[in-house]
Design a protein with these regions (language model features):
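Bacterial N-terminal signal peptides
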Residues: 3-13
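N-terminal mature-domain region immediately after signal-peptide cleavage
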Residues: 12-222, 226, 316-369
Length: 369
């Protein structure tokens, strides 16, 4: 089962998610690189990445891509959205890949998260995230849609599966990037709004039926990244749609904005419940009979992150990184890897990624030029 540790920081947010079956084929994505990305080494030893092409490999298991222009999401919503990941992929096949029907499917699997929201000494906010899973192929995706906010998000490409009988070479970069737009697990947009998905280990699921346009877990994340500037706007948007949990896994959302507002959005008996909190892991926070249900490890990670906030109410990017490190896989041993850790700067609009618990090397992305 994936594990994601999410910490909401008033300056940055930290999130971690995911777990996949062992033995992932890391060579499948991307298939051959063209010209390398532009990069420069910064004073903090981060590598600044300028994404110039659709998919470029940064290191084994971590790639970056960019999409600009019409992403089809407005048409997706106006057509009624989707109740399942299969319906999402059918929309993409019909809209973008009519000649490649059945080329791929989406296979979202169980995951968990921890997030933290905190303020820095300049009064800005950071958001941090860990994604814990087995080894996988991750894509950092810069999106600049025609009718929405630009954003950076992270996608587990192993959730996007090849259809039966399709060779990997037939899954072009174009197809993978389009599919990835509809499968983000976390991200930040140009307004500084951060979103992360966290799993809750509970037999209950989410299947709202109020006659509204339907969204899956990951398309809800895309909706917020494209259209919400603040937590209040995000909550208003979520209330306008019927949410359906991907693969029937119970999830909750960590959402934080550039003004320091941070909330957990949970669904109890298909009713949306909002709890203001700087820390979120993998158990219910909402008051009531569900409160506390989740893994014992998620309670431990929550306590660690809460303690870090108590000790340091104001944090630097390095402090957030260290907080994420403190709840990474090596401290618990339950999962194969913390696949990625992110520190989002909600004022500078940068995202600093650490891959597979190598906290001495990072990649820095900027949403806007």
């Amino acid at each position: 089962m994936m594990v994601i540790a999410i910490i909401f920081m008033l300056l940055a947010g930290i999130t971690g998610c995911g777990r996949q079956a062992a033995g992932a084929d890391e060579s499948r994505f991307p298939e051959g690189n063209s010209e390398p990305m532009e990069a420069e080494v910064l004073k903090d030893s981060a590598v600044a990445i300028q994404v110039n092409s659709e998919i470029e490999e940064l290191e084994q298991g971590l790639s970056a891509g960019r999409y600009e222009g019409e992403d089809g999401f407005t048409a997706f919503l106006s057509g009624g959205g989707a109740k399942t990941d299969g319906e999402v992929m059918q929309f993409l096949a019909d809209s973008f890949f009519a000649e490649n029907q059945g080329a791929f499917t989406m296979d979202t699997q169980a995951f968990g998260c921890s997030t933290l929201s905190v303020q820095n000494s300049e009064g800005d906010y950071l958001f941090g995230r860990n994604f814990d899973w087995n080894t996988c192929n991750a894509l950092v995706l810069i999106s600049d849609p025609q009718d929405g906010y630009a954003s950076v998000s992270t996608v587990n490409l192993d959730f996007i599966r090849q259809g039966a009988g399709m060779a990997g070479s037939l899954l072009s970069d174009d197809m993978m990037v389009i599919a990835a737009l509809y499968a983000p697990l976390d991200g930040m947009n140009e307004k500084g709004l951060c979103v992360s998905v966290n799993m809750i280990q509970d037999r209950a699921t989410i299947g709202q039926d109020r006659g509204k346009t339907d969204l899956t877990t990951t398309t809800a994340v895309r909706l917020l990244l494209n259209q919400a500037a603040t937590v209040d706007e995000a909550l208003e948007l979520l209330g306008q749609y019927d949410l359906h949990a991907s693969m029937n896994y119970m999830v909750h959302f960590a959402i934080a904005d550039a003004d320091g507002n941070s909330v957990a959005v949970e669904y109890i008996d298909n009713e949306m419940v909002v709890t203001r909190t700087p820390v979120l892991t993998n158990f219910y926070l909402a008051e009531g009979e569900k409160q506390g249900i989740g893994t014992s490890q998620s309670h431990e990670r929550f306590d660690i992150l809460t303690g870090a906030l108590t000790e340091k109410p104001s944090m630097t990017q390095a402090d957030v990184r260290d907080a994420l490190d403190s709840v990474s896989k090596d401290n618990f041993g339950e999962f194969e890897s913390t696949e990625w850790s992110i520190v989002f700067d909600q004022s500078a609009l940068t995202a600093v990624y650490y891959h597979r618990e190598n906290y001495q090397k990072s990649y820095s992305f900027r949403i806007t030029d």
